[in-house]
Amino acid sequence: RQEIKVVVLKNENWNEKITNLQPTFFKANQLLYTYTNKTNFWGDNEYYNFDTKFLRNRSLGIQQIEKKEVYHHYLYPENYNKYKKYTYFPDINGQFVIRTLEANDAEIEADYAMMHFSLNTYQPFSGKEVYVYGAFNNFELTPENKMSFDSENNTYRASFLLKQGFYNYS
């Protein structure tokens, strides 16, 4: 006797999953799952991304760089618009890749940079918290990646250290 449990993940994120699915049909040596709506996730736009493979130069997603105790990378601000239409832009489903052009073994030689995230809004989201997340933090909503609202600029902000590489985030 064998037991099979099916889990459908949204973008390899274990926090967004569908479980307890039962086969809709049984064939010889096959279990068929022919759901339509039950296995769909609510769509959203693609992940944002940035690349810090070279700390001293701006690259994808980086608006400004400052050299302090570590390099500070200020990402282009994202603009919140709940009416924004879906736009196809290939991403890596919230994942990240440690990489650098400044060393041979990125896993042990890549440096860290202070990443500055910002989300422009017209007003704070009433009763809601805003986070930066992706595979780099196991898609977890933690105090470290929670954004705080800057009422002077109507912008949510968060800053934390990340190792050099290519990142998807939301």
Summary of predicted features, one role per range:
Residues 75-126:
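Basic K/R-rich, polyanion-interacting modules in nucleoproteins and related proteins
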Residues 13-30, 116-163, 170:
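Aromatic-rich carbohydrate-binding modules that target alpha-glucans
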